[in-house]
Amino acid sequence: MRMKLGILAGCVAMGVALSAPAQNVVITNARIIDGTGKVIEHGSVVAKDGRIVAVTAGGPTGSASGTHIDAHGMTVLAGYIDAHRHIFKGEANAWLHDQAARNMKSFVDAGFTTVFSMGDDPHGILELRRQLSSGAMVGPTLYAARIIPLSAPTPPPASAAPRGPYTDLARTDPARPPDRPETAPPAIPDEQTRAAVRAARQDGFDAIKTFMLTTPGGPEGHTLSVIVDEAHKQGLRVYTHATAVPDALAAVNAHIDVLAHTAHIGRLEENATAVKTLLDSHVPMVSTLAVFIPHFDADNKPLFRDGGPFPMPRPLSSGGQGPVNARILWDGGMNYAYGTDTQWDPHDSFTDELRALNLVFSPRDILKILGPNTAAAIGKSSELGTLEPGKRADLVIVDGNPLDDVFNLTRVALVVKDGKVVSDKRGKRRAPT
């Protein structure tokens, strides 16, 4: 018994959350932006057993009980969702031991109660998900995609220049002309591809991730169709990286479920046929716009997402074209969702993505993108994205009105996940950035 108590005390001292049942919470005196288009200027939210049971104007009705939170006029929204994130840095076991708890807490501190990993160390990400779901650490609900290739690997050409210290492929995206490949890579046997999908399902992954870069006469489109067919048989959705318009078209023609990026290479304002094909597919698209705008450090140095100097000017052109393409598709009715595709601190990534979205979207648009659109894109509309009875009690309270200034979304004061307070920064919040 003494040993058990010692372990328990150690966990508490380190700020580690032990598994606990969902709780009840009552939030009063709040501005409520419920995600359906309705705003309640003075209202209450009641959650029981980790589920929302009431969202009302005025005070709570009936016998509401639980942790009481007076919002003092602050704004309550549904918990944020990042539908495209990469989490691990460096060797997986060392990261899990040394950084995971702090990193996961930083997500909920920034308001993110749900995160989708779009490609991390396979064993590490499943272990991280297990620890989060068991309550061994405080953090978001985590979903994980398994990457499956569309062609066999090929060695780099002998003439290829040696890579520098910063090796992020987005610096010189091979999807960008004139660097697109001109030779088709070897195909992968269909049954090998199907077996990889089945293995991902057996291992417990939530989705499949693919990278589409079409080549002349190449196998990519066929293999993606095979993956989609097998994934849907296994109950898995398929997310596809396609950064150029031709690759996005090939992906939707294979009937994928989600485009994991805004297609930022190619001018949709000059290609009405491509716009129509993308819209007619009804495939959601995830933003990830801030990859191609500089992230500024404390010394005002423009950095790329790998921490190195921002590689102007070629990626910067996508910083302009991506938002243009996004707005064109939005105006046509595309379900446009939120994701970052970075490894910066979640608060900083959020600020960067808002800067990019703010170029072409209104605060009202961005709230829809961040909430119900992203919930729909990851197939969780029945659980997340809006404040409605029956949905998961994942809530964010922010200081200020995001409809007046969208960057108020970053002024997170308190976060509730499954009816439990998991972050409380009232009185010690960052100034808006």
Feature map (PLM): residue ranges:
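C-terminal cap of metal-dependent C-N hydrolases
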Residues: 30, 366-372, 376, 392-432
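Histidine-rich, glycine-flanked metal-binding segment
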Residues: 32, 36-77
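Metal-associated gating/positioning segment near the N- to mid-region
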Residues: 74-136, 152-167, 246-260
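Histidine/acidic-residue-rich catalytic or RNA/ligand-binding cores of hydrolases
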Residues: 91-94, 125, 248-256, 291-307, ...
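Divalent metal-dependent hydrolysis catalytic cores, especially in the metallo-beta-lactamase
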Residues: 103-123, 139-147, 203-216, 237, ...
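Active-site gating loops and adjacent loop-to-helix segments of metal-dependent hydrolytic enzymes
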Residues: 105-110, 134, 138, 152-182, ...
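Active-site core of metal-dependent hydrolases
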Residues: 210-319, 344, 376-378, 396-399, ...
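His/Asp/Glu-enriched, well-ordered alpha-helical/loop segment
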Residues: 318-402
